[in-house]
Amino acid sequence: MKFENDNEKQVFDKLSRSLGNIIETKCDGYDELYGHKICKEIGSADEVQQYYNEDIAQSLLFKLCKAYQFNYDEIVTHLVKILKWRKKFNPLSCAFKETHNKELEDVGILTWYPEEEPNKRVVTWNLYGKLVKKKELFKDVQKFLRYRIGLMEKGIQLLNFQDEENCYMTQVHDYKTVSVWRMDSDMKSCVKEVINTFQTYYPELLYAKYFVNVPSVFAWAYDIIKTFVDENTRKKFVVLNDGKKLGKYLKQCPGDQFGGSSKSTIFEQNVKKVKPTAYASYLLERQEIEDVE
């Protein structure tokens, strides 16, 4: 953690001191962020001993401070919103309990590039070209959202919040073969809901977003997406009309499809088995017991 001035450090310290009270009084006691326990004042002594990692907790709090420019009131407002949403929506269930439509799972890919540049090691891919004739998959916005959140949560498990070189994710949106397609109202609703959800509940996690194979869909895809995001996020966007130019930015991506050094296909690179954190597993198991009772 690097503070630019004394004020930033003071805001961070104030948040750390107030966290227990904030969670207890404003978040219904829900103490989990991205699969990690963030407060040592909540829960039993055994839970704290087993699942609380101070370095990770502080790194996550620092991300929140950075996301909201070290404005204490803004940070608290968004932290409360995020934790209450996580308790209600249960994104850990999306990733590690629920079964999603197989056709959707073929569109969302997760890759791990250990030798890649900092914060380009965990990459989520959205292969929109595979959905050209599958518009029915967008009819149920909530089903689509839960699938996409599940992919996001799995990707987060591959991050290391104690490592500044692997504490952000990269995304790729591939629009190959989508040139004659038009975004209907159902897809617009899904795209808007996903973007709004990521903006609101996953701050300071995106390192870069690449839009590839987009010459003819630029107007309706990229421009629409830009409308839904803030300026800081837009600065992380890179648009490539040729998919093979992606290899310049992600050197370990598939060579045949994206110009990288790998001989594997994107589907062969797909990381399908991701383990939740010990704390996430504990919460999911506890939920199962509560559901049975």
UniProtKB/Swiss-Prot annotation:
Substrates-to-products reaction catalysed: a 1,2-diacyl-sn-glycero-3-phospho-(1D-myo-inositol)(in) = a 1,2-diacyl-sn-glycero-3-phospho-(1D-myo-inositol)(out)
CDD domains, A to Z: SEC14
Membrane topology: Peripheral membrane protein
Protein's UniProt keywords contain Ribonucleoprotein: no
Family to which this protein belongs: Belongs to the SFH5 family.
Function as written in the Swiss-Prot or TrEMBL entry: Non-classical phosphatidylinositol (PtdIns) transfer protein (PITP), which exhibits PtdIns-binding/transfer activity in the absence of detectable PtdCho-binding/transfer activity. Regulates PtdIns(4,5)P2 homeostasis at the plasma membrane. Heme-binding protein that may play a role in organic oxidant-induced stress responses.
Protein name: Phosphatidylinositol transfer protein SFH5
Origin species: Candida glabrata (strain ATCC 2001 / BCRC 20586 / JCM 3761 / NBRC 0622 / NRRL Y-65 / CBS 138)
Gene for this chain: SFH5
